Amino acid sequence: MIKNFIFDNLIILAVPFMIKTSLKTNLIFFFLCVFVPHMAS
């Protein structure tokens, strides 16, 4: 639960960064956000 809370905050903080970066970076970031938590749990 705490892990998910921290993870959600990281996504919120990353949004302005994602806007500034390229689409390719966004896709890589999205891939990590989706698949890494599933592998970890």
From Swiss-Prot:
Transmembrane segments: 10-32
Localization (cell): Cell inner membrane
Alphabetized UniProt keyword annotations: Cell inner membrane, Cell membrane, Membrane, Stress response, Transmembrane, Transmembrane helix
Top-level taxon of origin: Bacteria
A cellular component term, taken from the record's GO annotations: plasma membrane
Principal subcellular localisation of the protein: membrane
Membrane topology label: Single-pass membrane protein
Induction: Constitutively expressed, induced at 45 degrees Celsius (at protein level).
Protein name: Uncharacterized protein YthA
Organism: Escherichia coli (strain K12)
Gene that this sequence comes from: ythA
